Swiss-Prot record:
The gene is frr. GO terms for cellular component: cytoplasm. Belongs to the RRF family. The keyword Cytoplasm applies. Pfam families: RRF (PF01765). GO terms for biological process: translational termination. Responsible for the release of ribosomes from messenger RNA at the termination of protein biosynthesis. May increase the efficiency of translation by recycling ribosomes from one round of translation to another. This is Ribosome-recycling factor. InterPro entries: Ribosome_recyc_fac, Ribosome_recyc_fac_dom, RRF_sf. Keywords: Cytoplasm, Protein biosynthesis. The lineage of its organism: Bacteria, Pseudomonadati, Thermodesulfobacteriota, Syntrophobacteria, Syntrophobacterales. It is found in: Cytoplasm. One of its GO terms (molecular function) is ribosomal large subunit binding.
Length: 185
């Protein structure tokens, strides 16, 4: 019974960490990454379609993303969708492939990004703590229903705190790595 509660807590906290990592991948850090264009969809015969379903996306150089559509008639739509994406990226096309050069980040932009990354990690920590609160409420309910003893309640709350601390540490590690990546010139 408590094992199910802990498994649920770990699962939900793991999802919070995964969401943070996904959000971090979408940030433009001055380095080319396929994940920068992951969320972009282009119109293809009237249907919004993910870029990775329309083209081969590669990183030929550290600051360049190359998009090679399988159907060259969709190049114009891909360019429009990249410009509309609010990522601040400018696509250049030669009719066969689209190249996106990632500009070097200024010192001010780097500091702004570090603040954004810090805020995202704090939001993830809040999510993890909210999950801890929910789990502790479940444990208290089990105690009220006499399904567990008082000793088991305190041990369960200690275990919940240990799980929470583990995930907070993981969030800090992910944050530190992203901060280092952003500040790296």
């Amino acid at each position: 019974m408590l094992n199910d509660v802990f498994a649920d807590a770990r699962d939900r906290m793991s999802k919070a960490l995964d969401n943070l990592e996904t959000d971090y991948k979408r940030l433009r850090t001055g380095r080319a990454s396929v994940s920068l264009v992951d969320g972009i969809r282009a119109e293809y015969y009237g249907t919004p379609t993910a870029l990775n379903q329309l083209a081969t996306i590669t990183i030929p150089e550290p600051r360049t993303i190359m998009i090679q559509p399988w159907d060259t008639s969709v190049i114009g739509e891909i360019e429009k969708s990249i410009l509309k994406s609010e990522l601040g990226l400018t696509p250049m096309s030669d009719g066969k492939v689209i190249r996106i050069n990632i500009p070097v980040l200024t010192a001010d932009r780097r500091r702004e990004l570090v603040k954004v990354v810090k805020k995202m990690s704090e939001e993830s920590k809040v999510a993890v703590r909210n999950i801890r609160r929910d789990v502790n409420e479940m444990i208290k309910d089990l105690k009220k229903e006499k399904e567990i003893s008082e000793d088991e309640q305190f041990k369960a709350q200690e275990e919940t705190q240990r799980i929470t601390d583990d995930f907070i540490k993981k969030i800090d590690v992910v944050y530190s790595a992203k901060e280092k990546e952003i500040l790296e010139i």
